[in-house]
Amino acid sequence: MNQRDPSYDILFEPVQIGPVTAKNRFYQVPHCNGMGYMRPNTLAAMRGIKAEGGWAVVCTEEVEIRANSDNGSAAEGRLWDDGDIPALAKMTEAVHEHGALAGIELVHGGYSNANNYSRIPPIAPSAISVNSYAPVQARAMTKADIRDFRKWHRQAALRAKEADFDLVYVYAGHSLTLLMHFLSRRFNHRTDEY
């Protein structure tokens, strides 16, 4: 006997997302869980449980694309270089084992990250203080930095593909990302085309 209201049947139908098809409409959006790069086995098991429970798409938390986007004490995902691929591949394997798609959210924090771990000076569209509790100044990006920024995203997307992710997207919201900083007059005081 079906106890479900038929008006919700669409939730259980497949949906195409670009070149891939999710088996239903249950999409676990990116969220941090405190495991990230520090506990890849636990992260893979937790995301695998979601896939086993029926979610069609299971995503990472935000995944930093470069050491100059180090979110310090937050244990988020990292895809700084090829050495980070095996840890993320554990998650995709666990998710795929249950027939779900694996998604990854690429991010560069720009001025939002004081880079307490990497100690690399933060970058931003314009020179700006990082925040009130970290006495760090982000330096204004040059045009060469902007070209590198685009290159870092391409490299991270290729690494994500190598880790067997099905969906790759870029986090550009909540005033926490370099892309958002370029879009906001609050952070972007440039007078050139950027």
Spans of model-derived segments:
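Catalytic domains of carbohydrate-active enzymes, especially glycoside hydrolases
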Residues: 44-66, 162-168
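Short, acidic/polar
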Residues: 38-51, 148-158
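N-terminal amphipathic alpha-helix/helix-capping segment at the start of soluble metabolic enzymes
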Residues: 1-27, 95
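Non-globular sequence segments
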Residues: 93, 101, 107-165
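Conserved, mostly hydrophobic/aromatic
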Residues: 28, 50, 54, 95, ...
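N-terminal binding-site loop/beta-alpha segment at the start of enzyme catalytic domains
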Residues: 17-18, 25-41, 57
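Aromatic- and acidic-residue-enriched carbohydrate-binding clefts of CAZyme catalytic domains
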Residues: 65-66, 70-79, 115-141, 179-194
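Hydrophobic faces of well-ordered beta-strands that scaffold small-molecule active sites
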Residues: 26-29, 58-60, 102-106, 168-170
